[in-house]
Structures are given as structure tokens and as C-alpha cells.
Amino acid sequence: GLAVAMTFVMTSLENIQAGFNSFFIVRYLLEKANSTENALLLLMKLPIASNCNILIADKNGEMVVVECTPYEKRIRKAVSMDNGKIVCTVNSFTSDEMKQHDAAKGNDYHSAKRYDTVMESFSTHIKGNLIEATEQLLKGDYGFMCQYDEPDFETVWSSVFDLKNLMIYRAEGDPRKKKFVVDSRLHDVVQRK
């Protein structure tokens, strides 16, 4: 019942340090932690190699994004809305305190637009069947998300995690063109125990 995900944030070459990159952070936290609180304690002790956002959520609804640089970490808590709470991350830092560390300077494949689409959609469109509504969000039905038509940049996968039921819904590639399929491996492993 723990999800950990990452997004890259551009780092100036001179700021890269010895430490964990975002892929290893995700792997480490998934192997060592069992809750958002536990993952946060571990993450705050790790040396960070380069800029990234780490999204952490657990089956109890505790969720945060940690904006990380080699020199500083900042925790962004979930935003409460009428229909629940949400946390979102894109390929930039969204807190005012951390924006100065983002070397992309806005050249980040429309990160701000994607962030705004998620946050606005949660209050207006994400109701009823949350899995289906989130899939529609990722397909771009509510605004710009993953609709890249550039030959050198495309969506690798889009995933929706149901942490209470341990189910993953994944589109491998552009979710406008690829169907979301159910990945029940985690659910099945837990059921066998």
C-alpha cells in the first residue's frame, strides 16, 4: 500500500553531487518503507545527486511531494479540496522556495500547464469512478497532459494506482493511443501470502 514516483527537474551540471538519483530513491523507498511517514524519514536522510520530485502516497491517504536538490529538500503536503485531497508533481519545482533551483527556466515541456490541468480537473471533473476519471485526465480529456506530438519527446507510460485495492492501471505509451490495462501482480502477490 505504498506508491513512490519521481519526476526529473533540470539540474545545472555544476550542481550535480554524489548521492542518490531519482530512480534509486524510488527503488530504495519502495524496498525500505511501508508508509508515507516512514518513507519521508528515510528520504530526508539521503544525499541527493540531482534535482527531482519524489511523490509518496500510502493506502491511508497520506501523500506528499518532496522537492529535492543536492542541497535542500522541501515537503509539499497534499492540497485539500471539496472532494478529497490531491498532490501532483511535474517536471519542475512548484513551490516558490524551490523554483530558483530549476535549471530548465520554463523549458520543461509545459510542466506548469500540466500541473494546472491536474489541479483544476480534480475540483471539476474527478468524481464518481476515480480510476476512469483519472485515466481520462491522463488522456487529455480535461486539458493538456501527455499529448506530445514531438518526435524526440513522448510519454513512456501513464499509471493510476489504487493503493487500497493494490491495483495498477497502466498505459504503455501515449494514453490517447494505448489502452489502460490492469496490472494485478502486486494484488496477486499479497493475496497469496
Which role fits each region the language model picked out?
Residues 2-193:
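C-terminal, well-structured catalytic/ligand-binding subdomain of enzymes
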